[in-house]
């Protein structure tokens, strides 16, 4: 009976210590707006259990706890904190947690010029159950930050005491409550068993702290003795991290089939074509198939050397001749949208890396004032061509399909011949786009006029296109790119996707013709 009571008391003590650590770190993250504001939940907890400037009783700070299922970065940070911190609590050993917030990731603690803020949480299960939070370095708010969580504890073994250190790094864009912006990022995990890493703890010198950097062999750690320990990237990534993005990696079978690289088959034409144009398109399709069978929907503009030579010669000629180049001509020369359409729109974005202009609709944005646009937009060529070549081919096809929807929404569909000329693709590819538009009921024909296509601009079609095609980060969000933010709530904004307004024409009512012989004040006799 006595042993049963002791187990209950120990479990209650562990639960209290876990709550103390969890609420302390969550409150610090909340006060510095490190995650989405919807991730935090207010809890009724006594502030007397905490010590430190951030937990002053006179200021009456709000104690919160991190909630899962809202922000991916918060979920990853929460899982790692529960896995490693709570395991040390259950081991009944004294340890210290160091929470480091910095503006850079590479050598953030060796450089004094780097803005950073370090918090230490001392936990001793045998002493009074209080969390002492100390801040070491002043920190100025920055747009980017890095969270580093160090855990140190003495674990007693049969042979000797070993000191284990767990380093958790969460790298992301700063979440600003005023603008409501957030960006996805990666989460790295590192586990090291050494005493050299913790030599700075006793002296309190930050220049000897462990530094974190990326190398060709993976992730490496720099010790105070200037020795490097390379660690493979496969061990660093968490197994549970894949489950966080499973829902984003699932693509419906119909769209996945369309996004695969197309094969150039014969044209099942339903419209009148000249014999020369048909032979030319078929021969062009066969040549392209022999050259590169895994290419995307169209010939990529950047892979055409003749076009690049003309473009470079044109720029050199104009820049050498006159220092002031016309903005319109320069913009047209730098138009580098993957859709293949060289036509300028009133709503376009410029890539931050290559200065090329792309259409807003081709990237899933409904206008240049779309609140889902990132602060620094990169085109798919700069973003995917080197790292994700297969995804780049599929996104190129999706861009062409978005461009086709944008064109037929502005003006009626005029056949796949003109669509092929506009998208700079073959007739076979344009015919495939037309068939998909018809299958999805985006364009349709009437019985009386079967040779004319009409655009379906119903409210149901608008919601369908927004959900399936005009969601900017839908197909690349699982890759965790930093320049695409999370989806914001849709607000009233300018958009080309507007349902068609049905004009109601009031027709005059028919008046029954009656002959009246008597003349009254309200009714006059009809003139025959």
From Swiss-Prot:
One Pfam family this sequence matches: HORMA
GO molecular function (one): ubiquitin-like protein ligase activity
Region: Disordered, residue numbers: 507-528
Function (record text): Facilitates initiation of meiotic recombination and DNA double-strand break (DSB) formation at DSB hotspot sites by enhancing the interaction between rec10 and rec15.
Disrupted gene: phenotype observed: Decreases DNA double-strand break formation during meiosis and meiotic gene conversion at ade6. Decreases localization of rec15 and rec10 to DNA double strand break (DSB) hotspots, and decreases localization of rec15 to chromosomal axis sites. Abnormal sporulation.
Assigned keywords, A-Z: Chromosome, DNA-binding, Meiosis, Metal-binding, Nucleus, Zinc, Zinc-finger
Phylogenetic classification of the source organism: Eukaryota, Fungi, Dikarya, Ascomycota, Taphrinomycotina
This protein's record includes keyword Zinc: yes
Binding positions (Zn(2+) 2): 351, 354, 379, 382
Ranges annotated as PHD-type zinc finger: 334-385
Descriptive protein name: Linear element-associated protein hop1
Complex formation: Interacts (via N-terminus) with rec10; the interaction is direct. Interacts (via C-terminus) with rec15 (via C-terminus); the interaction is direct.
Domain named HORMA: residues: 11-212
Major site of localization recorded for this protein: nucleus
Organism expressing this protein natively: Schizosaccharomyces pombe (strain 972 / ATCC 24843) (Fission yeast)
InterPro entries associated with the record: HORMA_dom, HORMA_dom_sf, Zinc_finger_PHD-type_CS, Znf_FYVE_PHD, Znf_PHD-finger, Znf_RING/FYVE/PHD
SUPFAM superfamilies according to UniProt: FYVE/PHD zinc finger
GO term, biological process aspect, one: reciprocal meiotic recombination
One GO term describing the cellular component: linear element
Feature: compositional bias, Basic and acidic residues: 516-528
Binding residues annotated for Zn(2+) 1, in chain numbering: 337, 339, 359, 362
Localization: Nucleus; Chromosome
